[in-house]
């Protein structure tokens, strides 16, 4: 198959943006009733509902004695994991931990000679729930990316949920990654029922303060539904890559990077925006060549048919404009002056600069988080970070002398808003002086 090559203009841009928005989890209202039923059932029946849904959807029979992963199961997992993979998991964990450690914030206080103390107190969340997908694809990298920022932030307790196989077991790779990352408890439950258990609590699974981690449409809608009852990270949509390139880019590298995202699922988007017609055709040819060698060629072909684009722009300014409008989850810059282009990018989840910063480098190993905003939400959301696992409390302390100097100003403000009890709360401290 050949990727479609189109001239970038107002019509093609409009059609592209409309196509991408169709992939949003907000457009799956037909699933909401099913999700609500699951949430309500778990809220009411707790463990019994969790066990029933796990049997129905995953084919695994769980009890209060088997829902939590045991130390023996973790030891068994280590025996099954390849030594090379274990070494790589540990290296990646160190990189992720080192990167996120730089995001730490300290509490601060600003004191004045007049007795005024203002500040901000940083407090880690108490308990966090991490959702890790299961099924055919197993993602130990997602375990590390969700857990390490929470560990760096100082979260007291990290609970992980992940769906079991029909044998009632969890992938060894997932268990080993969880142990290496420092997860405190692991439960064999997935889907909307897992989100409900974390949000409301059951006899076996404790209620958490925040839920993070990607999942299918049922998980996404369940997270959306419990938001406000608990905090969540974001509503993850299908994966996206946008490559910005000029005539200096290597077409083989660009094609390989586009395919690396198209293989996720049929809703994934892979887009090249370039000023070079020669590169556009070469990339399309390279995609055809690679497809013959790849194990997920059928998924990739459907993904590219639906959401694969090569757009030809007149100028690099046009390329940058459309990149900022798309606000892609992953943005690669393969141009003559990539850092110069980077300074003009306002909207992107993660920015990969230069031809050797391939997107999978960020997925697995470099250190920055791979939990990124999708569906254009990079215009206002950020990657998962240490900030997602802390709270900030304002600190205010005034001496009598400090308050005395401003109390009439405060009273005037309160009276202007007709909040006389507010004014009185200040006035009563100085009423003997008036």
Language-model regions: role of each:
Residues 212-214, 234-245, 261-284, 300-311, ...:
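Short loop-to-beta-strand entry elements in the cores of soluble alpha/beta enzymes
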Residues 156-166, 270-276, 354:
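Short internal beta-strands
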Residues 182-253, 257-260, 264-269:
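Conserved NAD(P)+-binding/catalytic subdomain of aldehyde/semialdehyde dehydrogenases
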């Amino acid at each position: 198959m050949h990727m479609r090559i189109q001239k970038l203009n107002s019509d093609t841009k409009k059609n592209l943006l409309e196509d991408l928005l169709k992939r949003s989890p907000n457009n799956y209202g037909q699933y909401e009733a099913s999700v609500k039923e699951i949430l309500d059932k778990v809220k009411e029946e707790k463990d019994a509902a969790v066990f029933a849904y796990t049997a129905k959807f995953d084919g695994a029979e769980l009890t209060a004695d088997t829902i939590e992963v045991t130390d023996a199961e973790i030891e068994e997992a280590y025996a099954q994991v390849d030594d090379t993979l274990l070494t790589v998991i540990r290296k990646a964990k160190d990189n992720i931990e080192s990167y996120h450690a730089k995001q730490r914030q300290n509490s601060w206080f600003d004191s004045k000679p007049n007795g005024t103390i203002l500040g901000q107190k940083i407090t880690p969340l108490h308990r966090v729930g991490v959702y890790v997908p299961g099924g055919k694809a197993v993602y130990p990298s997602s375990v590390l990316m969700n857990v390490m920022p929470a560990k760096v932030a100082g979260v007291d307790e990290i609970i992980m949920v992940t769906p079991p196989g029909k044998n009632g077991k969890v992938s060894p790779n997932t268990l080993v990654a969880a142990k290496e990352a420092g997860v405190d408890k692991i439960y064999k439950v997935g889907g909307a029922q897992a989100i409900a258990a974390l949000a409301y609590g059951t006899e076996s699974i404790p209620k958490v303060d925040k839920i993070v981690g990607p999942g299918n449409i049922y998980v996404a809608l369940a997270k959306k539904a419990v938001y406000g009852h608990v905090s969540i990270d974001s509503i993850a949509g299908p994966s996206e890559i946008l490559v910005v390139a000029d005539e200096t880019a290597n077409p083989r590298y660009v094609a390989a990077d586009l395919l690396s995202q198209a293989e996720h699922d049929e809703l994934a988007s892979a887009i090249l925006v370039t000023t070079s017609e020669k590169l556009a055709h070469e990339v399309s040819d390279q995609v055809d060549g690679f497809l013959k060698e790849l194990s997920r060629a059928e998924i990739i072909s459907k993904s590219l048919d639906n959401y694969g684009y090569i757009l030809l722009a007149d100028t690099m300014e046009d390329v940058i404009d459309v990149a900022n409008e798309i606000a892609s989850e992953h943005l690669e810059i393969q141009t003559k002056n990539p850092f110069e282009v980077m300074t003009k990018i306002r909207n992107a989840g993660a920015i990969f600069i230069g031809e050797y910063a391939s997107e999978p480098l960020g997925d697995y190993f470099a250190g920055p988080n791979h939990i990124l905003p999708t569906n254009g939400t990079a215009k206002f959301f950020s990657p998962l970070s240490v900030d997602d696992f802390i709270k900030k409390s304002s600190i205010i302390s005034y001496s009598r002398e400090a308050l005395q100097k401003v109390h009439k100003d405060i009273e005037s403000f309160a009276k202007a808003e007709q909040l006389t009890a507010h004014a009185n709360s200040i006035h009563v401290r100085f009423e003997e002086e008036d």
